[in-house]
Amino acid sequence: MSTDAPTVASEPRGRALDVIRASGLADLGRGALLRVLGRDPVSELLHVVALLLAVIVIRPLLLSDIPVAHYEAPSIVASLILEDIYNLQRAAVFATPLVPRFLFLIVPTLVFYFTRRRLTWDDWEHGRSMRAAVMVVIGMMAWAGATLPYNVYFDQAHLLDRFLLVFFAAATWSTPLAAPFAARLSILLLRQANFPIGQDTFDYRAIADILVVFSAFVWLSHKKSYHPKHFLLLALAVFGSYYYATGVAKWNFGPPYSWLLENRLSNLTASAYAHGWLSFIPERWFMPLLGFARRFDVPMAAFTLFIEYGSLVAFFLRPSLTRIWILLCALLHFGIFLMSGIFFWKWLVTNLALFFWMRRGGGAEVVRAMCRNALNLAFGVAVIYFSFDRIWFSPQIGVAWYDTRFMEHYEIHVVDAKGSKYLMHPKSFAPGEVHWEQGAFCYATVGERSLTSIYGTVYDYDLFKRIEAIREPKEALALYRQAPICDNPQWRNTFDQFMLRFFGNLNRSGGFQHRWLTWIGRPTHIWLQPQGVLYDGQTPVVRVEVWRTLVLHHQNALHRLEHKRVRSLDIR
């Protein structure tokens, strides 16, 4: 019996295999498997994996901060090179490993030189079409870095560094090998805004990551098997990781669905208006428009989540969907600008550069080649999904809050020797103007309280509901009186040192220097139109005053509850 069982069982199985062979299903299955796991798709995946590994290695080099002493020098680059040479000498003497802060850029460049590998845009298939998109991004970052307003705090123009940035950005048109130099220089110049008071780099961080990807792509292109589709896949993954991370943060914030169904995005617009956005529009005209827009809070929140969550997969499914999604992301940034005056112009320009590149010609061929491989979809989704650890990209984690009707608005006023008072426009503190545009410096006061954060935002659901339940202005004041004191001696001392040095330098120089930089300069991240007599360096400053205004958006009107001087600092 045991010897007959296999024979009986094998007959139907054999007939089934014959049927499959006769029907051609085997050939179809084999063809599908080869398309997904064939030699070319797997080779393509290995190229992208190697590119991601290269990004992990070089990203800390291209994006690393440098000590503040280099910004004190007349030339950032010269100071870095001198330090690198000194440290290399010491490393050789003491046999210790060292990675230079700037001269590391020369190593891969020398590899190309000594191996006689002359890299041009024509070395890549559809490289010329890619050049147009890349040059827009590099040119934009070069414009942002090279036209930063004169740094009054450091009292340095860094003109040589600006020239070098423009030079390497322009040289990128001829040779992609100049792109890593332009990327590093633009980041170095932009990072000076973080001293001495740190500020978020979210307005250009994603673009910096894309430049890291392109720099790694350029250096790996010493091997001629790399193609623009490899770069495009990771460039889109950069954007996808940033959008997806913000969507996840909003969805998981507070009680289930609270950000979607209960948060009021129109409150952000009210706070932005009280802060100075669109202040040239009379309040009697603006508030009715805001009341109408309030009806669309939930649809706007739903659209935001749809775009951000969808970025996990939409960039890699089909060429047409890739183009549509990148355009929807641009539309999202334009909507944020209209609602708040917060202008992610670097993101917007990069979105549009990628869209027009992928729209026709060589770029359309590149995105089709990228989407043709199913492994690219799986890998792109995995890169985005696991990016929260910030090993390869730096997506903003926890970008979620509730927008309330109550706002604490801080302004800087200055007084001259005659007692005349002026309002400081936040952009006068450039290149670190974002911190002053946000207008949240309760830390600089003594004994003052703080109920909400930047633009009236809070991170506590119960506090959000309490503010939303306010029925009359006096309830808002009562709630504010219960808020915690925001006294911070360390931050207050940093604020004092900044003001003393900033206005000390300004008084000695007789006003703002190199104003031509602002004439050709880049747009600011936050747009404000403060109303009042603005200070423009017309007279020496003897005192700095911090003023705080409490504002409540109630019954379609802005109630300014308290306008108070909360700090005064003499300029010696």
Question: Where would I find each of the regions flagged by the language model?
Answer:
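Membrane-interfacial, low-structure loops and terminal tails that flank and connect transmembrane helices
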Residues: 2-43, 80-88, 115-131
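Internal/C-terminal transmembrane anchor helices
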Residues: 237-246, 367-399
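Extracytosolic and intramembrane catalytic regions of membrane-associated proteins
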Residues: 403-572
